[in-house]
C-alpha cells in the first residue's frame, strides 16, 4: 500500500532568466498548492527537496515540467508516512551549489553544462567500487560520510564541500593518474565537482548519475556496498539505501557505540552535528565538548528547563564541573 506523502528530490542546471523573480513566483505557486520544502534558485539552475500528498506533488511536478528548459527535469521520489518539511522556502542564491572556487582563488566557477564527469549507472558505479585501480571519492560533508558511505570510499579530511578542492590539490599525486569517480546524495554536487576535476587535468573522471538516492532504488544493485544510512537535509535526517546486507557504521560521539541518531550540539555557536543516543544526549547535555556543555546559551539546558543544580549534578556524574576548563 502506498504511503500518503511523497518526497521529491531534484535539480537541474539550466540558465534561468531573472532568477530572483523566478524564485518569488515559484514560492507563490508552492504556497498556493500547500507544498512544503526547501528550494534554491540561481542563474545557473534550480535545486530542491519538497514534500506533500500525491495530488500536491503531482501538481508541482506538472508545473515544473511546464517551465521553459525544465521539461525533462528528473524527480527522484520517496514515499513516506509524514511530511519531510514543516514550511516552504524558495531562496535566490548566487549558485545552487557553492564550490567556493572564486572565493579561494581557484579561478572561475564550473558550468556543468560545459564541463562535467562521465555519468555512471548504478551498475557501472558498483563495478567501479569493486575495481582496485579506481579511486572512489565521497564529495559530501564529514557528518554525512560518518552516518553512511560506500564501502572503500575515501573520506576527505574536510568539514564541508567547499574545502574539497584544496584537499584534492593537496593529495593530487596520490590519484592524479588513476580513474576517479565521485558521488553525492542526489548528483547536484558531483555535476560541478567532477567538472572541476576534469578542468584540473584528471583524464578519467566519472560520477554516480542520480546520486546515492538513485543507487538505493536501482532494482539490480539494490544499494549493495553501501554501509550505514544516507543523511538527508529534511525532517527524516536518515534514510535506508542498502537493501541487501545493511550494517550500521555510525558511532556515538561520546562512547563509540553503533548509532544512527543525529542531533546538533546544544551550543548554538558550535552547532556541530553529532551522532548520539538519547541517553548520552541527556548525560552530556547535548554538548560535544565540555565548553559546549557549560556554555551559558546551551539549548539543551534551556529546552529542558534545567536548574543550575541539575546541570551541576549531571556534570559531576561525568567528572566535570561548571568551570570552563574541565578538571
UniProtKB/Swiss-Prot annotation:
CDD domains: RHOD_YceA. It is an enzyme of class 1 (oxidoreductase). SMART domains: RHOD (SM00450). Residues 130-224 form the Rhodanese domain. The active site is at residue 184. It catalyses: uridine(34) in tRNA + AH2 + O2 = 5-hydroxyuridine(34) in tRNA + A + H2O. HAMAP family: TrhO. Belongs to the TrhO family. This is tRNA uridine(34) hydroxylase.
